[in-house]
Every structure is written in C-alpha cells, then in structure tokens.
Amino acid sequence: MFNSPLEQFEILPLLSFGANLFDFSITNAMLTTCVSLSFFLFLFYCLFSYGLNSFPTRWQLVLEGLYTSTAGLVWDSVGPRRPKVFPFLFVIFSFILISNVQGLVPYSFTITSHLIQTMVLALTVFIGVIIIVLAHGFHMLSLFLPGGTSIVLAFLLVPIEIVSYVFKPLSLAVRLFANMMAGHTLLKVIAAVAWAMMGSGGLLLIAHIVPLGVLVILFGLELAVALIQAYVFTILSCIYINDAIVLH
C-alpha cells in the first residue's frame, strides 16, 4: 500500500510546545525555511569573507552568475529606483530558487508548495508596491484610470482596474504554489508506479525501467521549473514595482 502523493505537503510538528491559545511548535516547514535562509546567508558570507579570486572557484562562478543575472533582470525591468529595490528582489529570487531546489532533495520539504508561504512572499512585494504608489499622492489615481479616458468608460474601467490590481498578489502566489505542487505530486506518482512494478516481479520488474526513466527526465524538468518559477516571480515583481514607480 502506498501513501497519498499529497502527504509530502503535510506540515508536521517536530517539537511541540505552546501556552494556552499560542502554539510555538517547530514544524518541518519552519525548519526548511530556516535551512534555506541559512544556506543563502552562508554562501554569501563565505564569498565575501574570503574575497573574490582572480581565478574564481565553482561556487564563486555560481554566485556571480546568480548576482549578475538578477541584476540584469532588475536593471532592464525597473525604473530609476532600481538600486534601491535590487537587494530586496535579489533576496526574493535567491530564496525562492533555493527553496524550490531544496524541495527536490529526498525527505526534504517544499515550502513553496504551500499557498500561505507564497502568499506571504507576494504580499511582501505588494506592501512595497503600495508604499511606492502612495508616495505619488493623488497622482496615484492615474494607475487605475489611463489618460484620455472618457467619463463613461471611467465608470467601467476603474472598478475593473482596482479588482485586477487587488488580485495581482493572489495570482503571483498561486502561480508559484500550483506549479511546485503539481510537479512534486507528479514525481511522487511516477516514483510510486516504478516502485510498485519493481515489487511485482516478473515482466513488471523489467518494465519498471520505463517509469524510472520517465522519473529521471521529469526530475530534470522539475529542476528547470524551479529556476523558471523563481525567474517568473521576480520578473513579475519587477514589472509591478516599475508600474508603481511610473504609474503605468
């Protein structure tokens, strides 16, 4: 008997303790989040502590590639405030990428497969967007009403623009959550099929090579999806921030 492929997304308490209505339990999701952040901080601590080498190591090449690719993304998508928002967007991109890849490690936990986690990331971006928009004062209303719009169309366009703007963080969060959850579920299903065929014996023992090969291919695709989803989340965040800056 095999467990449900969705059990891998269950949040389990590793250390339970609390007081009255408050629960301070340490869960697998919390532990994975701390590991992702610690790994990110450790890499860059080592890089800046030991300095940059004229003949870079593999880790230095990876980190420099991560930095320059994110910088190019922000520089191309964000307006005049790009030096101020780059550190934030770089941390967002790195954290999502590390979390996505870490979720592919056996017996690990994919925190980006939970809507609450991706929603927190999306709301963090949109809190910054709202702060930038409010800095424009009354000019921020042009974000919901394009110039030259007639009064008749304004009554139709303004509610539509407001609703679409409110749902942007939700779409940003759901896109990341759904892709990661679907990919990991598919991997678990294919792995369960291959394992069942191996345990059946006979011709199925030989035929299990087929789903096993599919599993290897899907694992490679899931690595690509982990990078693509981090990129998509970051590029959309750049676009939303740029729209808030130029009110477009």
UniProtKB/Swiss-Prot annotation:
The chain crosses the membrane at residues 29-49, 85-105, 115-135, 143-163, 176-196, 201-221, 227-247. It holds the Pfam family ATP-synt_A. GO terms for molecular function: proton-transporting ATP synthase activity, rotational mechanism. Its main location: mitochondrion. It is found in: Mitochondrion inner membrane. Gene3D superfamilies: ATP synthase, F0 complex, subunit A. GO terms for cellular component: mitochondrial inner membrane; proton-transporting ATP synthase complex. The keyword GTP-binding does not apply. The keyword rRNA-binding does not apply. CDD domains: ATP-synt_Fo_a_6. Keywords: ATP synthesis, CF(0), Hydrogen ion transport, Ion transport, Membrane, Mitochondrion, Mitochondrion inner membrane, Transmembrane, Transmembrane helix, Transport. It is a multi-pass membrane protein. F-type ATPases have 2 components, CF(1) - the catalytic core - and CF(0) - the membrane proton channel. CF(1) has five subunits: alpha(3), beta(3), gamma(1), delta(1), epsilon(1). CF(0) has three main subunits: a, b and c. Belongs to the ATPase A chain family. Mitochondrial membrane ATP synthase (F(1)F(0) ATP synthase or Complex V) produces ATP from ADP in the presence of a proton gradient across the membrane which is generated by electron transport complexes of the respiratory chain. F-type ATPases consist of two structural domains, F(1) - containing the extramembraneous catalytic core and F(0) - containing the membrane proton channel, linked together by a central stalk and a peripheral stalk. During catalysis, ATP synthesis in the catalytic domain of F(1) is coupled via a rotary mechanism of the central stalk subunits to proton translocation. This is ATP synthase subunit a. The gene is ATP6.
